[in-house]
Amino acid sequence: MFLVYEMEYLHPVNDKTSIQMIPFSSKYQEEYKRIYNKCYHEMRQALKIEPVDYIQDDSFFESCMDKVFLFVSGEEIIGSVKIKDNEIDDLIVNAKYQSQGYGKQILLWALENIKSEKIILHVAEWNKKAIELYRKNGFEIVNTISINYEQDYKEVQ
């Protein structure tokens, strides 16, 4: 069991981003898979979520990838984010570019590109670094959700 915070964008920030993001393209599929799995590996391992490497095969890429945007330099993915209606999801930064401000820039890009009054995201309590980023950029915890991964996962199937 672990906790997930629902956070809402309640305190708008005036910061703007200068980065440009592009829609996901299949030419980045293998690199995205590697970066995504690496970004979530430690958390999924600590929370005992199986499989630890979430993207196992190409079936992951069959849905919702039209909502994923990449920040690319040259041919390398620096980071990405998924925008689902009014929700920011799967904001990741390539490990070699972490702690350089790219997470904030990707978050600001997402905020500028969501056309909704209410913007939310969900983050595991374990992910202190992400929670701090979100708080510094106008998000506040509005709900705490308890996840029993094994039970909830079985109920979904």
Predicted regions, residues:
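Conserved active-site alpha-helix within GNAT-family acetyltransferase domains
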Residues: M1, K104, W126-T144
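Acyl-donor-binding surface of acyltransferase catalytic domains
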Residues: M1-S18
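A short beta-loop-alpha structural element at the N-terminal edge
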Residues: Q20-R34
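Conserved GNAT-fold acetyl-CoA-binding loop/helix
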Residues: N37-S59
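A short helix-loop-beta-strand connector motif used in the catalytic cores of GNAT acetyltransferases and
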Residues: D58-L70, E87
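Conserved beta-strand in the GNAT
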Residues: L70, E75-I92
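Conserved acetyl-CoA pyrophosphate-binding loop and the N-cap/start of the following alpha-helix
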Residues: Y97, G101-W109
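Conserved beta-strand-loop-alpha-helix junction that forms the acyl-donor binding cleft
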Residues: L121-I131, I147-V156
